Amino acid sequence: MFSHVVIFWTKPENANAAADLIAGAEKYLRPVPVIRSFHVGRMVSSPRAVVDQSYQVALNLTFDSKQAEEEYQVHPLHLDFVEKVFKSNCARAVIYDFE
C-alpha cells in the first residue's frame, strides 16, 4: 500500500476556500480509478499541543502501489483539480508520501 497525504493552507482572502477544496476533491479526485481509499476533511481542533492546527484541509489517499500513485499524478481529473480548484484556493500545501 502507498499513502499520499496532502495538507492544505487556504488563501485567507477566500472565505470559501476550505469548502471549495473539499468539494473540488470530491468532484475531481474521488472518481480517479487508481485511488484505493479517499478521505478529505477540515482540520479538527485539539487541546493537545502536539497536534498541528495551522492548516485548514487535509486529503488522505491510498493506492495499491507507488506506480498507481504515479498514474494518479498524471490523470486528467487530478490535473483538472490542480488547475480548477487547488490554484485558486490554496496558499500552501505539504505532501507526505509513505509506504
Please annotate each region the language model reported.
Residues 25, 82-83:
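Short, non-transmembrane amphipathic alpha-helical segments
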Residues 76, 80-81:
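Short, compact, well-ordered microdomains
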Residues 1-56, 60, 64-74, 97-99:
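Short S/T/G/P-rich N-terminal loop/turn motif that feeds into the first structured element of a domain
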